[in-house]
Amino acid sequence: MKPTSSFLNLPQSGIRRMYDLAKNKKDTVSFVLGEPDFVTPKHIIEAAKKKLDEGCTHYTDNAGILPLRQEISRALKQYDKVDYDPEGEIVVTVGGMMGMYMAILALVNPGDEILIADPSYTNYVGEIVMNRAVAVPVPVYEKDNFNFTYENLKSRVTDKTKAIILNSPCNPTGGVATRETMETVAKVALE
């Protein structure tokens, strides 16, 4: 059986391509996967083992383990002063990309457009394409600290625009969204 055209037309991950090139090179410092260069701390490993020994080896709720969602809710309230219901407003996914995929699936229809910074994390395009939406690159520049400006963001909006992906700090540029950037994105979204 041959793979579908949807599968064959997915863009290859530039990050994985770089990972494959660098993995067998000596003295290479890899910035590819965004994982730490240290072993998981011992107390975390021991806590995971303890939970396994206690029988926590089965499927979780679809939204994730309730005590974890409750702790996330508590932390959000304490640190960010926002209140989310752990039983209906918080979902734990198996990773950031799965969370992005689910958010895109929930918010856009096939053919809808999603604005993304250019340059941006290469896997965003794949996530968007897998949801049969259209990635619309919005150039960001060093002179603007790789932040969206009103003009460059607004110029890419069409009647098909349904979402804007804002990643801060941005991979790969390192740009950090300022309050002004957040207000700009909100203004464009509301218009």
Q: What is the meaning of each model-derived region?
A:
Residues 22, 128, 188-189:
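A generic structural signal for well-ordered alpha-helical segments
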Residues 106-128:
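Conserved PLP-anchoring active-site segment centered on the Schiff-base-forming lysine
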